[in-house]
Amino acid sequence: MCFERRSLTTSVKGDPMTTLDDAVALATDESGLAVVSTLRADGTIQASLVNAGKLPHPATGAQVLALVTYGRVKLANLRARPQLAVTFRKGWQWATVEGNAELAGPDDPQPWLTDAEQLRLLLREVFTAAGGTHDDWDEYDRVMAEQRRTVVLVAPTRVYSNG
């Protein structure tokens, strides 16, 4: 079952539809573990395991899916081709969120992200939205900055599931 963003609660037939909340809830017991799929330059899929959660967009307040990433492959894919799919599961139940990535980080400036302190706090917010906890936030902040971590925000264009 799938739907467009303009109708997040019911389908055309009146059947209940999968929402962003439904999708994220599947991974609540597993610290937001999900598979993110991006497009390589040759059009094939690159998939990897991430922690993802839901939070208000820092500029608009709209509910978005968020994750943190770093490294060459996934970021290069998202910079060139921002389309992605994030799939959550619990047992045999699954839900996929599709949309376009909005990147925010030290190498991906956004007009609403004006300084390193805002990025530091946003990285923490995304981590905790995905169910993460940390015993030493100073260490967490240091590693995020050292690895030049980037926040990926996804405004869902489609959410669908097998249930």
Regions found by a protein language model. Name each.
Residues 3-14, 92-163:
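Charged, gly/pro-rich active-site loop segments
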Residues 31-70, 78, 84-88, 96-100:
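Short beta-strand segments
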Residues 12-35:
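Short, basic/aromatic recognition patches
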Residues 42, 73, 158-160:
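Glycine-rich nucleotide phosphate-binding loop and flanking beta-alpha elements
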Residues 25-29, 79-80, 145:
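Alpha-helix boundary recognition
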Residues 69-72, 79-83, 128-139:
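Short acidic (Asp/Glu) patches
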